[in-house]
Amino acid sequence: MKAIVVIDHAAGSAGLTLTDRREPSAAINDVIVQIHASGFVPTELEWSSTWTDRAGRNRTPSIPGHELAGVVTALGYGTTGLSVGQRVFGLADWHRDGTLAEYVAIEARNLAPLPGDVDFTVGASLPISGLTAWQGLFQHGRVQAGHSVLAHGAAGAVGTMVTQLAREAGAYVIGTGRAADREKALDFGAQEFLDLDNDALEDVGGVDLVFDVIGGDVQKRSAALIRGGGTLVSVVGPVEARPADGRAVDFVVEADRAQMGEIVQRVRDGRLRTNLGTTASLDDAVAALNSTERRKGKTIIIVRP
């Protein structure tokens, strides 16, 4: 099968290579999925799991990419809840070969049914951004109606999901980003927008929840804005700053079939829109993933047109 692999950690995205790999086989509780579309997060080339297995051993050449939508072609022993020929989408294990390939072996629990009226491209755009927003807001952030949410990166793939889900929950959303992000952030539902290059973050005043996708100085300044009992939620590693009278949580997103079902149903209902950016074929993926242009939305690789 065709696959994108990485070997040299230091090379970054420049080290991505299109090659031929043996098709995977299904282990116990695994499913083989013929991939139609794959999502890719540029920062995953910085994650240790891209390069090593759970025991810390080098596993290169490895296949990156962790989001997928496709069709089940084989079931491993003990697999339940899915069937051959079924349309699915999901989130691949961090420490196994990923989804920038024609086929992937993936645990069945990491997949959810993809309804026939949802395009594979849309399905592949949902797992990381949708689950990150869902888990950050509801499991870790405990967002409630009437809360104020400061959503950093509000025009990005995660930020637009955070904004929409927070608004649906009855929260007031203040989005941040660069000046060029204002229109998109407001279009996806932010009620206010702050230009981090030109506006004073402190002018936001107190908020109940900060959803941080940036870290560093922005995280530290944001922590100071959190009201008593509020929460700082970070997806960029260990929290460096904590609110004076509140909680700070950092987490790594996990696959959850029920949550993916909730997310895709909202897409079907029109309550949730995806933020699609660049799309490219698997043959053109290396060039697309090495583009120097600023990414505008989720990058999706069309594996099977």
List each model region and its residues.
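C-terminal hydrophobic helical "lid"/dimerization subdomain
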Residues: 1, 260-305
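Glycine-rich beta-strand-centered segment in the early N-terminal region that forms part
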Residues: 22-40, 51-95
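NAD(P)H dinucleotide-binding glycine-rich loop of Rossmann-like/cofactor-binding domains
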Residues: 90-153
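Mid-domain Rossmann-like dinucleotide-binding core that forms the NAD(H)/NADP(H) cofactor-binding site
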Residues: 126-195
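Glycine-rich cofactor phosphate-binding loops and adjacent beta1-alpha1 units
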Residues: 174, 184-249
